UniProtKB/Swiss-Prot annotation:
GO biological process: mismatch repair
Region (Disordered): 794-816
Record has DNA-binding as a keyword: yes
Function: This protein is involved in the repair of mismatches in DNA. It is possible that it carries out the mismatch recognition step. This protein has a weak ATPase activity.
SMART domains cross-referenced by the UniProt entry: MUTSac, MUTSd
Family per similarity comment: Belongs to the DNA mismatch repair MutS family.
Entry GO terms, CC: cytosol
Positions bound to ATP: G613, P614, N615, M616, G617, G618, K619, S620
CDD domains for the chain: ABC_MutS1 (cd03284)
Protein name: DNA mismatch repair protein MutS
Pfam family membership, one: MutS_V
GO molecular function: ATP binding; ATP-dependent DNA damage sensor activity; damaged DNA binding; mismatched DNA binding
Length: 857
């Protein structure tokens, strides 16, 4: 479309604007509709399921188009944003009555998934984050912005692995990366990844724009002055936010420097397996958050989600939260606070919309109600003696002047938008009241005029009325129109009627319509001025909102502690993880029978538990509940256990369950091995590691060998490890690894049917119960019977060269009777395996040796 002269004036105007936003859908305001043209129309018609048509011609071709009513915009925007689309809103800013040629239009806002602020487009209980990334293979700068709250963070991260784990944690809906990065990098595979010009990330420009935004000389006060990569990313984010919002951003007041060392790190697999806030099916039911979130406000739910996804290693913060929960439980004080907190609502996002100058009348009404509830809440907070709660109370103000202003200004139940007025109270502004009175008295004038004209003309069917297109009129039936007086001027002909206007009615119309339009303009001006007044108080209001959100989360955790029977964990310096009567917080809520609680003990004498037992016996539940108890402790929450004593952990790893990564071309076994490799490379003696059925995705010998070697390596790393397996050969590990112990989930058989007891007991399992589980799953009886025959034969098979793998220590429970898989290996492989010095082998040498062993089979 380089030659615009061939187009009509309207399309020339359209293309000048469209060329500035080639990759976004443009909604072009024409009267009461937003019209969409050309390729945008084809795409929008398909996505929105609306009719695609054509509008005249331009440059010799018909124009594909579709449209939506202007008052239905929000619903269509919501659908497009959920589909990941961005939309440019182009409004008429000129006056059609005075315009020569097309009415002047401008882009007034750009809607993207990461920069939306409209309540209708947002999930109220989820952060809506946009991130920007700058760096190379070794070091990355990451900036994250929530435009709906003003939260703005930066950090620098070493390596792709840590970066991808962090991106999984924050889960941004948009991710901005430099356009000069190579194609196909891991970050670009995330949904919402968008390339931006390299100069958008310029570090010097970024530093200047950030200092200007925060009105500071430098960034030292934010602790990020030397994070040049993160500053470049933050500058890109700030520029993108200003570009889309087309206004100042006064609610963005500071940068917060986050450090991965301050947090318990969970990789993508661990977050998925633990189902913190999203279950394995992609929903929210039966997640940890679904059980522990009874927050009164949406802003508190979002904060709790952030806590769950960013557990802390800061003992000072964790103990302050624990003390706060104890205080709120004392005398059930949380019960008094929660109804008052509910009155506060989501003022965090309301304040952001005020800062963006797009707050709606109902936002201000909700803020008015929230400010009105603050004095009573402040009185209740004054009774809380816990130091952290006292700090929150000190931050939370009452703002009587603002509360009074909003009470005087906004009617009790305002309309959704300011567009048609009717928002401000009578008495708030005398000039507005006068204009409205002039407009509203029109009704009585028309009644009086109709009565006078009927008397003057003798025409009983005469009516006086008004419509938005033709204004005021006097209507007569067609048969009586010829009897109209001479001062009646014909205005409109209808089927069966004629409409007229008189000089008197015309004079009144000019006065009334002028008063109405002037009243609307006055009300909009006053509304904008009200927003500016609130913007002047934005900083303390935002601080209060943050404090109230945290108070809500802590009150919620106190309520959950009482009603879910949670107890306060103790953090100790001694390396340990001891749990008495631990429970799975989610599973126990969905069971119809009592949950079987279990103990766990890991310390300097025992760092790994080999867990055996039948399928469905509870091994995975036992492991997951341990991880969730540790995680809940690291957000400052009480935990589902009678007693819990632990030291700080640095990471939580899970290798539980796998599926094919078809898009990535990886098999189930490859996914499993990738997760295992990540654990073996990154686990430390402060890590919690859950390993479930490692090695099951390949041949028996390969799988057992890999599981054995992985377990030995984790024992040597001294990581807190729960290692569930069906390879009973691994139960001899305690004989060679002093930090390893056996436990099992017990079960019993009755009348050839299995009964799961779910108790964790010392020692290895006595048998696998695999056939009983298969029978429970509905495997045909004839197959079960045949399997029993095969099992009996296999269990009695004895080969001449069978030898024990390791001698049994005195007092050690008998290893369960099961065919020894290693016993059938040819002698050369056994001999080679016995000569290996595993401590001196590199990972590469270990893999090569495994291949050599396999070739000897």
């Amino acid at each position: 479309m380089s030659d615009l002269s061939a187009h009509t004036p309207m399309m020339q105007q359209y293309w000048k604007l469209k060329h500035q936003h080639p990759d976004q859908l443009m909604f072009y305001r024409m009267g009461d509709f937003y019209e969409i043209f050309y390729e945008d129309a084809k795409k929008a018609a398909k996505l929105l399921d609306i009719t695609l048509t054509a509008r005249g011609q331009s440059a010799g071709q018909s124009i594909p188009m579709c449209g939506i009513p202007f008052h239905s915009l929000e619903g269509y925007l919501a659908k497009l944003v959920k589909l990941g689309e961005s939309v440019v809103i182009c409004e008429q800013i000129g006056d059609p009555a005075t315009s020569k040629g097309p009415v002047e239009r401008q882009v007034v806002r750009i809607i993207t998934p990461g920069t939306i602020s409209d309540e209708a487009l947002l999930d109220e209980r989820r952060d809506n984050l946009i991130a920007a990334l700058l760096g190379d293979e070794r070091l990355f700068g990451l900036a994250v912005l929530d435009i709906t709250s003003g939260n703005f963070t930066v950090q620098e991260i070493k390596g792709w692995e840590n970066l991808l784990a962090e991106l999984e944690r924050i889960n941004p809906v948009e991710l901005l990366i430099p356009d000069d990065w190579p194609q196909g990098l891991p970050a670009e595979k995330r949904p919402g990844a968008r390339r931006r010009a390299p100069w958008d990330f310029d570090r010097d420009t970024a530093r200047k724009s950030l200092c200007q935004q925060f009105a500071t000389q430098d960034l030292k006060g934010f602790g990020c002055d030397k994070l040049t990569l993160a500053i470049g990313a933050a500058g890109c984010l700030l520029g993108y936010a200003k570009e889309t919002q087309r206004t100042a951003l006064p609610h963005l007041r500071s940068l917060r420097h986050e450090r991965m060392d301050d947090t318990v790190i969970l990789d993508a697999a661990s977050r998925r397996n633990l189902e913190l806030d999203i279950n394995l099916a992609g929903g929210r039911d039966n997640t940890l958050q679904s059980v522990i979130d009874r927050c009164q406000t949406a802003m508190a739910s979002r904060l709790l989600t952030r806590w769950l996804n960013r557990p802390l290693r800061d003992l000072k913060v964790l103990k302050a939260r624990q003390d706060s929960i104890r205080c709120l439980l004392d005398g059930y004080r949380f019960e008094k606070l929660q109804p008052q907190l509910k009155e506060i609502g989501d003022i965090e996002r309301i304040l952001a919309r005020i800062g963006l100058r797009n707050a709606r009348p109902r936002d201000l009404a909700r803020l008015r109600d929230a400010l009105g509830a603050l004095p009573e809440l402040q009185n209740a907070m004054a009774e809380l003696e816990a130091p952290h709660l006292a700090r929150l109370a000190a931050i939370t103000g009452t703002y009587p002047e603002l509360a009074g202003l909003l009470e005087r200004a906004i009617i009790d139940n305002p309309p959704a938008v300011i567009r048609d007025g009717g928002v401000l109270k009578t008495g708030y502004d005398s000039e507005l009241d006068e204009l409205l009175a002039m407009s509203e008295n029109a009704g009585q004038f028309l009644i009086d005029l109709e009565a006078r004209e009927k008397a003057r003309t003798g025409l009983a069917n005469l009516k006086v009325g008004y419509n938005r297109v033709h204004g005021y009129y006097i209507e007569l039936p067609t048969k009586q129109a010829e009897q109209a007086p001479g001062d009646y001027i014909r205005r409109q002909t209808l089927k069966g009627a004629e409409r007229f206007i008189t000089p008197e009615l015309k004079a009144f119309e000019d006065k009334a319509l002028s008063a109405k339009s002037r009243a609307l303009a006055r009300e909009k001006m006053l509304y904008d001025a009200l927003l500016e007044t609130l913007i002047g108080h934005l900083a303390p209001l935002q601080d209060s909102a943050a404090a109230l959100a945290e108070l809500d989360v802590l009150s919620n955790l106190a309520e959950r502690a009482l009603n879910l029977d949670l107890n306060c964990p103790s953090f100790v310096d001694e390396p340990c993880l001891r749990i008495e009567q631990g429970r799975h917080p989610v599973v126990e809520q969905v069971l119809t029978t009592p949950f079987v609680a279990n103990d766990l003990g890991l310390d300097n004498s025992t760092r790994m538990l080999i867990i055996t037992g039948p399928n469905m016996g509870g091994k995975s539940t036992y492991m997951r509940q341990t991880a969730l108890i540790v995680l809940m402790a690291h957000i400052g929450s009480f935990v589902p256990a009678a007693r819990c004593e632990l030291s700080l952990v640095d990471r939580i790893f899970t290798r539980i369950g796998s599926s094919d990564d078809l898009a990535g071309g990886r098999s189930t076994f490859m996914v499993e091995m990738s997760e295992t490799a990540n654990i073996l490379h990154n686990a430390t003696d402060c890590s919690l590691v859950l390993m479930d059925e490692v090695g099951r995705g390949t041949s028996t010998f390969d799988g057992l060998s890999l599981a054995w070697a992985a377990a030995e390596r984790l024992a040597q790393l001294r990581a807190y490890t729960l290692f569930a397996t069906h390879y009973f050969e691994l139960t001899v590990l305690p004989e060679s690894e002093p930090l390893v112990a056996n436990v099992h989930l017990n079960a019993t058989e009755h009348n050839e049917r299995i009964v799961f007891l779910h108790h964790v007991l010392p020692g290895p399992a006595s048998q696998s119960y695999g056939l009983a589980v298969a029978q429970l799953a509905g495997v045909p009886a004839v197959v079960i019977q045949r399997a029993r025959e095969h099992l009996g034969r296999l269990e009695t098979t004895s080969l001449p060269h069978e030898t024990p793998i390791a001698s049994k220590s005195k007092g050690e429970p008998d290893v369960p009777h099961q065919s020894d898989l290693f016993a059938s290996l040819p002698h050369p492989a056994i001999e080679k395996l016995g000569k290996l010095d595993l401590d001196d082998m590199t990972p590469r040498q270990a893999i090569e040796t495994l291949y050599q062993l396999k070739n000897l089979l």
